[in-house]
Amino acid sequence: MMPAQALCPQPGEKVLDLCAAPGGKTTALGCRMQNKGLIVANDISPKRVKALVKNVELMGLTNTFIVNESPERLRQIYPEFFDRILLDVPCSGEGMFRKDREAAQSWSRYKSDECAAIQREIVKSAYEMLKPGGTMVYSTCTFNPRENEENIEFFIKNYELMIDKLEPIGGFEPSRSEWTQSKDPTLSGGLRLWPHKAEGEGHFVCRLIKKGNKKDNEEIGPELRYTSKEAEQAAQAFFEFAGENMNTVVQGIFHLKGSSLFKLPHYLNEVPHIKWEKAGLYLGEYKKGRFEPSQSLVMALKKEDFKRIIRFEKNDHNIIRYLKGETLFNDGENGFAAVCYEDFPLGWVKQDGQMLKNMYPKSWRMM
């Protein structure tokens, strides 16, 4: 996760992961930010964005706005908005040949010159979304200088960008300024990972700073607000559910998309008119006046946040039965409860007598 480490986001910042799926980098950013601030995680592929949603939910992130748009569309919505932007751009994939035979077979279809042109368009959009004084990390999984050092040379020549040198760690080596036309020594400020010299595949990472003075983000205090009358009705049903089943209070700006209720993340006061999958914390479904909690909600909470928990110890066979979606049995009070592996929530059950209705998502279940 060197790209996320190089970006070094701080709690409370506005961060964009522009090519985010399947989500490993986004979750690494989220852990560093401690669910404070905003991560806009985008992927242009509708299929890949589904995996992004699942991984964000598995990690219990609540500050993430997951979108499915082109960079060109996003730059219209977010001019000079972000403190930091991560660009793990599509590339020719030469660094993955050893690991992924399909990458080698498809190499002839993804010519390096074509990839470099796409990468430059992505950076153009990202540059317009980055605040003056903001940080951008550019990374690929290819060896080709055309997509790496030569692109960085183009960026610092054509934009108000400068290289912020990365120190080699963990088997990384300095990037190769001698492979560029200008031979500018600052172009050795990026990093390369060679698979024959270190554990891992081939990667390139470079950190860039946009020239100018950085403005601090505006302070936003806690508030309770609804984006529509329907959202307020759904939120009231959620508050009733929380009063009966939870020990914690969730406040913020509530938004209803269809029957799905969300608590919006920090800095997102309303949902812009773009294609999106998840906005902050997905609380659950509101249908026919009733609220049913989501898997996302249980993953975002701690065991002490629930009024009822069903705790399984290590090696208890009921853990596997739960993850397979099987019905469990237990003596206890009727209502919703969190199933926990020791102290870690796994998902919901709904107790009715001795029977526990398994609410673990079907798409997550073990086969």
PLM feature spans:
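Short glycine-centered segments of the SAM/dcSAM-binding site in methyltransferase folds
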Residues: E13-K14, L38, F65, R84, ...
